């Protein structure tokens, strides 16, 4: 049984994790085996995602005065909380891939930029491009625009002759 001091330590740790998070994903862990949970934790470490199972009351106290305080009324039942630190869609990607292999898990909702994202719209968060993907897309757009301009100039020169 947790005493008051232990609970306060848990709340402060979760609060620190929450404040450094870009997004939070809440999942119903019912039906996940311990081996599957270990695999989830391994894959989450690679993408800088913390996965925690915290008592609902302690989680409600931990999110007070953070950008995730809108979650308070949704923290009910059995929950697995995933905190994304480096990219807002990391946790969503991990669990979307996991649900393809395991139908037992259910993504409840996510929070990104103080907005609740329901399970039906989780793809929005999971498909957000990473920083590297955004840079590559931007470079490709610039290259395409440059090539199109060069072709137009060559056509104009050819037409003027």
UniProtKB/Swiss-Prot annotation:
GO terms for biological process, alphabetical: translation
Family matches, as Gene3D superfamilies: 3.30.70.1730
Gene Ontology CC annotation, any one: ribosome
Keywords: Ribonucleoprotein, Ribosomal protein, RNA-binding, rRNA-binding
The organism's place on the tree of life at top rank: Bacteria
Gene Ontology molecular function terms on file: large ribosomal subunit rRNA binding
Keyword Ribonucleoprotein: yes
Primary role: Forms part of the ribosomal stalk, playing a central role in the interaction of the ribosome with GTP-bound translation factors.
Family under the similarity heading: Belongs to the universal ribosomal protein uL10 family.
Subunit structure, as described in the record: Part of the ribosomal stalk of the 50S ribosomal subunit. The N-terminus interacts with L11 and the large rRNA to form the base of the stalk. The C-terminus forms an elongated spine to which L12 dimers bind in a sequential fashion forming a multimeric L10(L12)X complex.
Name of the protein: Large ribosomal subunit protein uL10
């Amino acid at each position: 049984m947790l005493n008051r001091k232990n609970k306060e330590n848990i709340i402060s740790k979760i609060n620190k994790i929450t404040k450094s998070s870009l997004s939070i994903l809440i999942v119903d862990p019912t039906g996940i085996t311990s081996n599957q949970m270990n695999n989830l934790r391994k894959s989450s470490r690679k993408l800088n995602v913390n996965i925690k199972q915290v008592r609902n009351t302690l989680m409600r106290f931990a999110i007070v005065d953070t950008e995730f305080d809108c979650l308070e009324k949704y923290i009910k039942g059995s929950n697995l909380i995933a905190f994304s630190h480096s990219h807002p869609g990391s946790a969503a990607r991990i669990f979307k891939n996991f649900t393809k292999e395991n139908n037992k898990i259910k993504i409840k909702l996510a929070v990104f930029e103080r907005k609740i994202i329901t399970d039906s719209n989780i793809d929005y968060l999971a498909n957000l491009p990473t920083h590297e993907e955004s840079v590559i897309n931007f470079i490709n757009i610039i290259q395409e625009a440059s090539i199109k301009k060069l072709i137009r100039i060559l056509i104009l020169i050819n037409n003027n002759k």
